[in-house]
């Protein structure tokens, strides 16, 4: 064997030893990289991102549901963080959702990347007891973000001390936990902030101030679905919202959420049978809703509205069998008007035939034997229901009857100042009263009118949208205040079927314009006649000068000039 052949053949043990050495070096290097990577995985920038998320949250009484570790059952801090890591991943991916391409959405994506990188630092040693030591919480988003920030902060501190600390076996600690997850799911998806009653203030988060117990716009959706026949006013035509402090009760906004208890209502009893401010009793709203029809939807579709009933009141006497003084509140838009089938009073008609006969309200939820007495207010002849003098909002309801019409004589200026508007629009009183409707449905018989309607100057396009029968308007003074039949409802939107009465100011303006035009035409005719007469005189003068006699002095002078020698 040559030296070259001996040198080319190396023992197999030599090659194996070198390979093992290379593998050991690679493993040790990877372990060192993992340890260094886990120790500095969470930086101060991630904690700042979480703090910015906390600072950008809106303070709200809305609560969200999520699952997290019950620290009372799991005392070991390492096992607590190890169990919470999986839950934090679920919260970041499913619960923390923001609009795309926003700072909060970008911060959430960075937190998701961080949680994916931390998978190599946490060793999962539990499979069977996945729900152990886990409890369902129902807290505010602010509290949830604070828990997540505390988790990352504590994890950062443990990894800086020992990168392999989360390889600890926590099965024994998880086995000690008892499942006592009895927290129910919230019954709403928190689309808007809910009110926090005084009874729940102790359980609210310390970072949120208690929400007010009245939300003016929270029950808007409920009103749109529950309002009955009344007024289909536009937002610009709605009267100002006025609340009577004696009759208004505080309550949480109407919604499908029933988790919050209603606030306690003070009960004010007044022994005197006058319409004083009393505390509402349960069932008043049911009585009001049951007394109204369901034709409001058709009326809204046809574009009609009963704005003439804005000033009529529904009052309940405190002498009913139920007990206590009843005075319904007017927090809803449909409470500002009565039902549309009742006819309204015009300028030339005043309320008469007012009796003290009680009005029986039948409620399907109550026995029919219970009645509510009406205490109307008699008005004199000077008080009329005009559009520019009536109250745009009354703190009472009006119980209207074809035989009896109640009128409120209290001027608007003496009521309480308006606080809020149901549509969020506050209009001046003058601008509100100046708005008139352009859809006037009156029959030709009404325009001809009787003695009650002659000589009265009616404004153009009254806002009451009268739909009264011709027989009702043909009557004279004897029919004023008498019971009039209910006009048939027309659900089909029509154009103007009757000729509207012109405004006196407009007719006067047209009269003056026509008069000025006639005067100008007369003056122009006179000027044209004088010019024509002068034009006829000028040709006569010219003809007379041409036809002069030959023996005149002028002709002789001309002959003399011609005969002169050159």
UniProtKB/Swiss-Prot annotation:
It comes from the Eukaryota. This is Macrophage colony-stimulating factor 1. GO terms for cellular component: CSF1-CSF1R complex; extracellular region; extracellular space; perinuclear region of cytoplasm; plasma membrane. N-glycosylated. The chain crosses the membrane at residues 509-531. Glycans are attached at residues 106, 153, 171, 302, 353, 355, 357. It comes from Rattus norvegicus (Rat). Residues 253-265, 348-360, 400-410 have a biased composition (Polar residues). The gene is Csf1. It is linked to A defect in Csf1 is the cause of the toothless phenotype (tl). Toothless rats display osteoclastopenia, severe osteopetrosis, and dystrophic growth plates.
